[in-house]
């Protein structure tokens, strides 16, 4: 046998050994305990591809910066998660959300997802054409309520009620919670990525007075995340519109008591109770009360239960700045309400949870309720061809010590 033939035989034997070695069982120490299969993240939720905007960090971990934003076009462009680098902590979840696999199981259109309700239980759902609650006359079957705007009847899903016996069903948080988005496009920018899309809402499933297009832009950069919605009346009748957002902001340390909240609102709307959370029409000055979070550095959340609406908002450089600070994590996030139409801020922060939902919105709760005695409650009137834009920006900061 030639030297060349011997070489080829040895090479073949080595190849066979190598392949067999790749298939051999792991050592007993590795296989003694069966390992659970890792959950496979879904590629779609709501019948549309999940969009993840990403960017590479540029500060070597020395300053706070946003890293990613996950958006669900199949669920009304819900901003499901945002991640950021925090010096000393590394990458953290900015929003309180389950895994994508768990979210897909919850966002299933079942009994707990009526009208898309599960969308506003985590992440950041957009609330159009009305944030908050709307009361009205309940239908005989208990499925809808009717209310009036400028003498015209509006029928809405009665998709929510409190937990107490006899709680009144009402409409809650808009009509796009489970909507699909058209023309979804992503673009790489100088310092991140942007996603855009349009919800051709029409008359919102027969519930609204005209036809509406909603144009979304979610922009990720290192120093900010911007969310913008423009609503345009593309129908033939005038219509009311309000826009809001329902992001659940994490408290990274998990220590809710020491977390601080700053809300530049001089009054809150009194509610009947924290189960219905229906406004009474009375606006109460916050000065001297536990609801006074106007100090520049805010005050600790401590054990205060919040599901309250602030108004008479003071602006800084034209924006309504609400701050959530976690001193234990050396972390702060600023929610800047840029649109002049933003009239109120709702904050939902139960003392047993490690988040604060900060909702910058156009309107008061139950905006057409008789309790307001004709007051301007923030609903914007769009005539055919008119539009209005809601714009909120998130900015990270390091709190002063």
Predicted regions and their residues:
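C-terminal motif of bacterial Sec signal peptides marking the signal peptidase cleavage site
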Residues: 18-21
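Short, conserved catalytic or interaction motifs in soluble domains
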Residues: 24
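Surface-exposed acidic/polar loop and edge beta-strand patches at domain peripheries
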Residues: 28-228, 234-243, 247-401
